[in-house]
C-alpha cells in the first residue's frame, strides 16, 4: 500500500475545531477511497458508505433529519458510536445522491462532532445536474496521482525519499535519483500502475492498466457531457489530446478536427472539472498577484505522465535517452514538472499554475512556469545548457525589476549561480535537479533566508 502525503493534510483538518465536512476531489482511480481507508485508522469509529450501493444510498431517503439518517446508518452497519470519541463518516460516490450533497450543510450545523469526508469518481456530473456543494459549509482537498516522493517510498527507496524531503542529497546519490526520476516519469503516478511496477519492476506489464484507465475515462464521458455532440468532442480529445501534453494549444480545429474553438474549449473544461487535465494560462505581468491572460492560448497538462507515454507511444524513448530533456523534444519533462508543481499547489491550498509570455509585439520570450513565493514571482525554466542560453529567463528578469532569484530545472546537480543578463541585471539562478521539484517552496525558503 502506498503512503500518500495528503494524509498529513487530512490529519491537520481532523484536529481543527472549526472543521467543516470535507469534499475530496480527484480523477478516477487516483486512490481517494484507499486514502480515506488509511486515514480512518486515526479514528475510534469508521463508517463507510458507498452510494453506488442501494443499501447505503437509501439511508438518505428515509428522512430529511440528519440525526435520524445517522441513526439509521449506525443501525444498518451495526455500529455503536460514542459522540465523545472520534468518529469518521466517509460518503463515497456522493454524486449518486444529490440529497446527500445538500445535507452536508446540516451535518455541519447540527452534528459538528462528526468528522465527514465525501468523495466521488464523477463529482463533475453534479455540474451537469446543476447541483453544487453548500457554499461556506464544506471545504475541499484534491488528490492527484502519486508524487516522486510517494514513488520512492512505494519502490522501497525510503532513505532516498528522506534525503529528498530534507533537501540534503549527497552528490554521490545524484545519478541514482535522476535515474529513478526518469523511471517515475515513465511509469507515472497512478496507484495501480505504480503498485504493479513496484512488485515486479517490469514496465511491460503496465500496458493493460493504462488501457483500462483510458477505457474507463472514455466510458465516463456520457455521464458528464451535456449532449451527444460533446460526447464525441471529448472522446476526440481523449484520443488525440495526449500528443499535445506540455505544449501551448489552439482550440480551433484541435487535433486535426473540424470542431470550433468554443466547442473544444468547453469540452476541455469538462475534462478539467473531472481532474483529467489542466489548462494553464500565461501571465504577461511580473508582479503579485499573478493574473492569467485567459484570452491567450493555454498549455495543456494531463493528469499523468504514465498514461501520456502509453497513449502516444513514447515509452521506448525513456530507454533510449539518458536525459529526460531529450525525451519527446522536452515535452515529457515539462509535463512531469507541471505534475509535481500541481501537487505542491494542492497541498498548500493554492489553485492556479501559470507560465509567462512577454507582452511585446514581435517577442517570442516564454518562461515555462512562474511560481508565486510569498510576495514575489519566481520564473522556472525547464532546460539544460549554459546560463547564456536562458534567453527567456533573462528577458523575464530584466522585466521584473524587483526579482532577484530564478529557477532552472535540469538533470544536473543542485547549485546556485550568480548570473548577469546581457542588459546588466544580476540575479541568483537556482539549478534544481528534477527530483527536487516537489520541494520547491522549501528550496526557495532556504535561498531567500
Which positions does each model-derived feature cover?
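Conserved catalytic segments around the Walker B and adjacent sensor/switch elements
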Residues: 42-56
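Interdomain hinge/linker elements that couple catalytic modules in large macromolecular machines
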Residues: 153-336, 346, 359-362
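Short glycine-rich substrate-engagement loop in P-loop NTPases that contacts/grips substrate
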Residues: 53-85
Amino acid at each position: 500500500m502506498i503512503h500518500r502525503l495528503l494524509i498529513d493534510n487530512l490529519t491537520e483538518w481532523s484536529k481543527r475545531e472549526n472543521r467543516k465536512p470535507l469534499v475530496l476531489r480527484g480523477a478516477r482511480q487516483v486512490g481517494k477511497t484507499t486514502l480515506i481507508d488509511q486515514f480512518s485508522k486515526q479514528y475510534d469509529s469508521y463508517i463507510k458508505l458507498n452510494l453506488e450501493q442501494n443499501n447505503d444510498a437509501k439511508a438518505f431517503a428515509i428522512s430529511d433529519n440528519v440525526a435520524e439518517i445517522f441513526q439509521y446508518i449506525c443501525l444498518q452497519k451495526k455500529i455503536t458510536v460514542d459522540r465523545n470519541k472520534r468518529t469518521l463518516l466517509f460518503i463515497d460516490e456522493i454524486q449518486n445522491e444529490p440529497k446527500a450533497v445538500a445535507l452536508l450543510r446540516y451535518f455541519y450545523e447540527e452534528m459538528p462532532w462528526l468528522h465527514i469526508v465525501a468523495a466521488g469518481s464523477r463529482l463533475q456530473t453534479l455540474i451537469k445536474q446543476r447541483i453544487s456543494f453548500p457554499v461556506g459549509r464544506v471545504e475541499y482537498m484534491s488528490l492527484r496521482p502519486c508524487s516522486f516522493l510517494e514513488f520512492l517510498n512505494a519502490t522501497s527507496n525510503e532513505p532516498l525519499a528522506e534525503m529528498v524531503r530534507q533537501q540534503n542529497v549527497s552528490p554521490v546519490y545524484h545519478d541514482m535519483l535522476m535515474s529513478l526520476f526518469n523511471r517515475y516519469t515513465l511509469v507515472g503516478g497512478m496507484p495501480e500502475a505504480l503498485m504493479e511496477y513496484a512488485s515486479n519492476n517490469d514496465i511491460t506489464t503496465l500496458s493493460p492498466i493504462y488501457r483500462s484507465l483510458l477505457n474507463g475515462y472514455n466510458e465516463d464521458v456520457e455521464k458528464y457531457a451535456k449532449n451527444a455532440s460533446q460526447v464525441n468532442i471529448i472522446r476526440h480529445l481523449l484520443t488525440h489530446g495526449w500528443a499535445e501534453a506540455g505544449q501551448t494549444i489552439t482550440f480551433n480545429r484541435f487535433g486535426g478536427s473540424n470542431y470550433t474553438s468554443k466547442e473544444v474549449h468547453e469540452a476541455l473544461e469538462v475534462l478539467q472539472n473531472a481532474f483529467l487535465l489542466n489548462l494553464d494560462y500565461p501571465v504577461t505581468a511580473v508582479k503579485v498577484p499573478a493574473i492569467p491572460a485567459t484570452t491567450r492560448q493555454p498549455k495543456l497538462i494531463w493528469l499523468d505522465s504514465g498514461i501520456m507515454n502509453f497513449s502516444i507511444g513514447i515509452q521506448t524513448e525513456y530507454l533510449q535517452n539518458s536525459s529526460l530533456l531529450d525525451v519527446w523534444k522536452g515535452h515529457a519533462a515539462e509535463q512531469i514538472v507541471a505534475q509535481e508543481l500541481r501537487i505542491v499547489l494542492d497541498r498548500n491550498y493554492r489553485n492556479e499554475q501559470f507560465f509567462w509570455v512577454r507582452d511585446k509585439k514581435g517577442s517570442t520570450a516564454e518562461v515555462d512556469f512562474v511560481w508565486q513565493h510569498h510576495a514575489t514571482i519566481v520564473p522556472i525554466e525547464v532546460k539544460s545548457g549554459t546560463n547564456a542560453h536562458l534567453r527567456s529567463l533573462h528577458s523575464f528578469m530584466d522585466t521584473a525589476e524587483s526579482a532577484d532569484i530564478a529557477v532552472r530545472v535540469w538533470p544536473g546537480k543542485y547549485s546556485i549561480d550568480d548570473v548577469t543578463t546581457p542588459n546588466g541585471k544580476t540575479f541568483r539562478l537556482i539549478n534544481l535537479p528534477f527530483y527536487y521539484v516537489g520541494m520547491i517552496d522549501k528550496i526557495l525558503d532556504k535561498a531567500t533566508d
